[in-house]
Regions:
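Conserved lysine of the Walker
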Residues: 10
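Hydrophobic anchor at the beta1->P-loop junction of P-loop NTPases
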Residues: 2
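P-loop (Walker A) phosphate-binding loop of NTP-binding proteins
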Residues: 5
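A basic- and aromatic-enriched beta-loop-alpha substructure that forms the phosphate/nucleotide-
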Residues: 58-101
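A glycine- and Lys/Arg-enriched "phosphate-lid" helix/loop adjacent to the NTP-binding pocket
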Residues: 83-163
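NTP-dependent small-molecule kinase module
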Residues: 138-212
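Hydrophobic positions on the alpha1 helix immediately C-terminal to the Walker A/P-loop
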Residues: 13, 17
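Conserved substrate/cofactor phosphate-moiety recognition/catalytic segment
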Residues: 19-60, 82-86
Length: 212
C-alpha cells in the first residue's frame, strides 16, 4: 500500500510501483466520488457521509487487492480513521458519528483477518514539506481542493500534514518505509528508478529475511 498526505504524490508512486511489479494498481475513488465536492463546500454536513463512502469503497478495494501478490493499493484503510478523527476534532463529525464509524471500521478489520492475506506486505509512506503539498494541490487543479480564498481549508491541510507524521510513527499493521518525495521528484526518470530500487530492497528483506 502507499500512504501519505493529499497532494504528496502517492498516486503517481502507486502507478510506478504497479507498472514496475507488473501488477494492478487500485486507486482511491476520488474522480467518481459524488460526496467529495459536497464535503469541501460544506464539511459539517457531509463529513460523516464522506468517511462512510470512503470506508465502503476502500473495503471492497482491499478484498480485491489482497487476492493477488504485489497488487498496489493507493491509500489504506488504516488512514481513514486518521481523517475521521481529524474531522471530529474540527467539529465536522460528532462524537456519536465518530463512535459509529470506529465500530464499523473495527468490524471490517475483523473480517479482513479471515482473508488468506491479512495485511499488506509493505506500507510505503510518502512525505514532503508543506509548501510542496500546497503547490501540488494547486497544480492538479481540482476546484474543490483550492484554498487561495479559503484559509480554513489551508489550515485543515496543515493539520493533516502534521497528523500524518505522528500516524506514520505509530503505524504497526505491517512493515513500513518512508520515501522523501521532496528529494525524489517523480517526474524525473532517474528518481523513479532510485525510489523503485529502495522499495525492491525493502520487499526483498521482508520476503527473504536472513536466517540467523
Amino acid at each position: 500500500i502507499t500512504a501519505g498526505m493529499i497532494g504528496v504524490g502517492k498516486t503517481t508512486l502507486t502507478g510506478l510501483i504497479a507498472d514496475h511489479l507488473g501488477t494492478k494498481a487500485f486507486y482511491e475513488p476520488v474522480g467518481d466520488n459524488p460526496v467529495l465536492p459536497l464535503y469541501y463546500s460544506d464539511p459539517k454536513n457531509y463529513g460523516f457521509l464522506l468517511q462512510i463512502y470512503f470506508l465502503n469503497k476502500r473495503f471492497a478495494m482491499i478484498k480485491k487487492a489482497l487476492a493477488d501478490d504485489n497488487n498496489v493499493l493507493d491509500r489504506s484503510i488504516y488512514e481513514d480513521a486518521l481523517f475521521t478523527k481529524e474531522n471530529n476534532a474540527e467539529g465536522n463529525i460528532s462524537d456519536t458519528e465518530l463512535n459509529v464509524y470506529l465500530q464499523l471500521l473495527d468490524n471490517m478489520m475483523t473480517e479482513l483477518t479471515e482473508l488468506p492475506k491479512k495485511a499488506p506486505d509493505l506500507m510505503v509512506y510518502s512525505e514532503t514539506d508543506f509548501d510542496t503539498i500546497l503547490y501540488r494541490i494547486k497544480k492538479r487543479g481540482r476546484d474543490y481542493e483550492q484554498f487561495d480564498h479559503n484559509p480554513e481549508l489551508e489550515s485543515y491541510y496543515y493539520k493533516m500534514w502534521t497528523a500524518y507524521r505522528k500516524w506514520y510513527d505509530e503505524y504497526d499493521a505491517s512493515p513500513k518505509m518512508k520515501i522523501d518525495l521532496q528529494q525524489y521528484d517523480l517526474e524525473k526518470p532517474a528518481n523513479q528508478q532510485a525510489v523503485l530500487a529502495q522499495i525492491d530492497s525493502e520487499l526483498g528483506k521482508i520476503r527473504n529475511p536472513t536466517t540467523v
